[in-house]
Amino acid sequence: METKIKIFETGISDGIMSKNPKFYPENYTEDQIKEEFLTTRLNIGKKFRFNGKKILQALQKTDTNKLDYPDGTYHLITDEDINNDDLWYVEIPADILIIEEKHKNIVVGNQMADCPILIVEDRKQGITALSHCGAPYINRELPFQTAEALIKNFNSEPDNLYVYIGSNSKKESYIYDKYPAWATNRKVWDNNITNNNGKYTIDMESAIIRQLNELNINNITISPYDTVTSPLYYSHSAFVKGNIDKKGQNFVGFFYK
């Protein structure tokens, strides 16, 4: 069964996919940041053949933004959502964005700088879900919830679901000096966080795959790139450890062709 979507990833050569002032010179005004960020998006759009103003990203709850919605909340993209000139500024509080094939050339995606982005495509029905699955979200079983949203609410069959796990911090690079405080779900992390002589190796990909396998989903493709070590990607972890060239945000997304 052939894919109906185009998946893409941006990296350092494409520019910073964020309007956060911390990624720009201190003397930049808000208008200068917006202008440069728009130019970055338009150039990325030209590269991958979509309109750089037609990018949607979920407003996902964190420990600091005080958003409150049930875990695994999804939003199905509507005509109203895509009615604005610049979709980057459309705020959709949700963990999961879902879009149907009828909305051609509308990008659904998410920023990332080490966290895996999960794309689940129902190739038969022409509907696709995306979520940002950093380790704390994997801990609360967002990968499972992302695929389950299609199965329970849109009658997707597991055999028709094809999954892409984006570039991320691989287990060889994701290491803690102690067991991570956010890893409270032992079912998720059993054998996916391993103690190697006092160093805790975290395997996000295997934790995601386990959750997908629980739903009998086996059509899974994984990006081979480690954002921490690859020169192609920004990486928060690498930046924190002193590599200033890795300061920034990548973007992983898709659109219906």
Predicted regions and their residues:
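Active-site microenvironment for binding and transforming phosphate-containing groups
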Residues: 1-257
